[in-house]
Each structure stands twice: as C-alpha cells, then as structure tokens.
Amino acid sequence: MNLVLQEIYNFWNIQNSNIRGDEFTGYEPVYDQFDTLDKPAYNKDPEGTVQKVFDLYRSINLVPIVYYTEQGLIRAIRDFASIGYNSVKDNKISLGNNKGQPISRFIFTNMMTAEPKGRGHNSLKDRFYDDKKLKRAINLCYSMREGNKLCYPTAVRRALELVTGENVQNFKPQHARSIVEHLCPVLWGNVYDYSCGYGGRLLGIGSSNMKYNYIGVEPNTETVKYLNYLNDLLDEAVGVRGTIIQDVSEDYQPTDIDCAFSSPPYFNLEKYSDEDTQCMVRYRTLDEWFSGYAEPTI
C-alpha cells in the first residue's frame, strides 16, 4: 500500500475488516439493521431508537464518511471528470454541487485538525467521538428529515456538520472547474492557485477537459504531502499533473499565467497549523496581514 494512503488509513482507524470494496463506509454489515430503525420506529420510541443507532455506530466506530482504496480513488476521480456539471451562466453558478468533496474529505485528514477561530477542536471527527454530539446528530436525522436511510452514514455525517457551529470547508471542485473554464477558456492554459488548501481546486481544475496546467502554492507541509498524493492520482486517472510548490504566496513570483484563482485564508478566522509559514503566524495584526500577505500575493 502507498505510504501516504497507509497514513490516511491510520488516521481514520481503518482496519482490513472495514474494507468492503474500493469505496466503502465500513458500516455495510449493519445497513440491514439501519433499515429497521426507520421513522415509524423513531416516532414510536425516539430515545430507544436513537440509542440503538448510536450503539451500531459505536460498534464499528468509524467517522461516517466515504473511504477508498487506491483503485477506488482513481475510479472516483475518473467518474468525477466524466460527469456533467453546472457551468457559469450570467456570471452566476448554482449552489449545492458537492461532487468530488468525498475525495478531499478522505485524503486531507488535516482538515480534521484545523480550527475555526474560538472553537478549538470541533472537527467532524471530534464531534463523532463525542457521545452527546453523536446522539444529537442522530436525533437530527429523524427530526429534520423524512424518507428512507435516515440514519445511514451520509445522513449522520451531514447532521454532525450541523451540531455546534462552524465547519472548516473545502472549495467545491465542480465550482472550481466551472469558474476557471468561464474565466480562462484556453486549452492548456496556465492557472495559478496561490492558496491550494485541501485540493478542491486541484481536483476540479485538473479534471477539466481544457487540460489546464495547474500551478499551486501551499505553505502547509502536511497539506503539501496530500496535494502531491492527489496529484499522483490525477495523473493516473486522467493523465494530467499539476505543479505543487511549497512556499508562501507573498514570496513566490509566478510567470506566464493565464488565470489566477484561489480561496485564501481570511487572516485568523481559521487555524490550519502552527508552522511559521502560516500567514496568521507571520503577521500578528490585521494591518500587518494586509500589507505583508494580501497585497504582495495579489
């Protein structure tokens, strides 16, 4: 197994017994029990139903996201590259297109250690392993939704994101692809991303039929490791490889760029790491941040 993928598996506590194909949640053995814990069961016994669902989740104890083998990742990237998507129309793009997000959510485990300002450790993983928050999320699955599969992993993951406030978000890959194709309708165009983040733009832009040359700058050592892994997967899946540069955008000088597009940090609203290359560490006040980071980057 690839060493980076093994690190990812270790972070998510994935064991061989959890792997149920190239794309899995780990909860496949209890799906039939989830099916019996439907809305009528909840209406009859809310507290008991929530407890039964909670016990099933704790019996496996994996954060309820989609997991992949390496072949599963390659297949998922190919599927992402081939599906239809909403383009920019009248300078607008529709909301809600989350295709590709599960790939980044799985690979970029350090998204789980980033902290919204003032919230401390409150990631999806933290919430899942907090019994009270998990039970609140399960209750939300029933009280706010109708239909089937109310307590399946996707539903519980979405409910956990509603529990106790802010979430560190990744840029939607489909939006990145649509926006860059709108701004830069140039085959093999050079697209500069001055704040790579968790791979949403790399995945979206790298999957475009325009075959862009993606150039991305990112200071975070751990994030760069996962960006390089995603870059390798893109090369294998669709034959496109970007350029990942570990540097700070205020110092890096790009050349021959057709389009610059990114989603930079907003001073200290989110903490990604304690490395001295982080702009919130380098620049201690908002004025210093504007003059030292924002203006040179632009």
Language-model features: locations:
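Class I S-adenosyl-L-methionine-dependent methyltransferase catalytic core
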Residues: M1-R78, Y85-G100, M111-I298
